Structures are given as structure tokens and as C-alpha cells.
């Protein structure tokens, strides 16, 4: 079995993990976890330029990662448009992809008009990417998720932030 381990909504990630962990424990079927951002970028791994995989995280923040030639240029993080721009090569074509990536792409073009930015109005099917990445993980004999592993949260929840105050 395979699931997106995040980033994503707190509730959605917890529900996915709870459901698949129950099946895993009942039937001894391993679970492989794949990054949501990696799934969005996967169809463009041969793109001649940089691929920014994003999810609008609200509050002027984005969950983002940058890839080039199937290599990670910027690790996944909860970040700002300015931080993402600092990792970009201004001499390369830049492709935006991901959930609601149009929001990010529009802001990127406005903030850094010198960049050669492209995006598509519709993205590929992330489910196909999810299964392709999982098949590769199995072929490469990568470890499935451990029993104690859970979602990948790049941001603290509102409740955690309230406790810190």
C-alpha cells in the first residue's frame, strides 16, 4: 500500500494514516509513504529546467520544494515566496506545479518578473505518480514505513501554536 505522507491538511493526513495503519496491522501489508510535493513534481522529472512543487499553505506561506533533473535543489519546507526565489536559477526555465500552483505562479511572476516561469492550468494525475514512485521504492528495496512513523507535518497546528503562547 502507498499513501502521501504530507505535507497536506492535518485531518486528511491523520485519516489516511489511521485507515492504512489499521489495514497494515490487520493483514501485515507494508505501507510506503511518498511526499505529496514529490508526487506533484514526478511527471516533470525530465523537464529541462527547475520544477517548483507547491501547495498553498495560506497566510502568505507555501509548502514547497524545488527539483532539477530528478534531484532536490530545495528541501520541502513551509516557506515564503522570497525564500523560494533565493534557490532559483534565473538563467533556467521554471515550471510551477502542485495543488493550487496557479496562486504561487502568479505571485512568483509578480515578485520576480525577470524569471522565465511557466505553469499549466491542469496538473497531471498525482495518483499515477504516487504508484510509480512506490513501485520504484519497492524495486530498490527501500524500507516501508515503520509502525511508529506518521504524517510529515511541515507546520505546527493551531493548537500547538496556542500552547506555546
Predicted segments with their positions:
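Catalytic-loop motifs flanking and including active-site residues across diverse enzymes
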Residues: 15-16, 80, 126-130
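Buried hydrophobic packing segments
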Residues: 19-23, 40-44, 130, 134
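Acyltransferase
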Residues: 119-165
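Surface "functional belts" at beta-alpha junctions
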Residues: 30-124, 153, 163
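DPxDG-like acidic metal-binding loop motif
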Residues: 2-31
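Long, hydrophobic/aromatic N-terminal blocks
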Residues: 1-7, 76, 81
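Glycine-rich, flexible loop/turn motifs
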Residues: 6-13, 51, 75, 149-150, ...
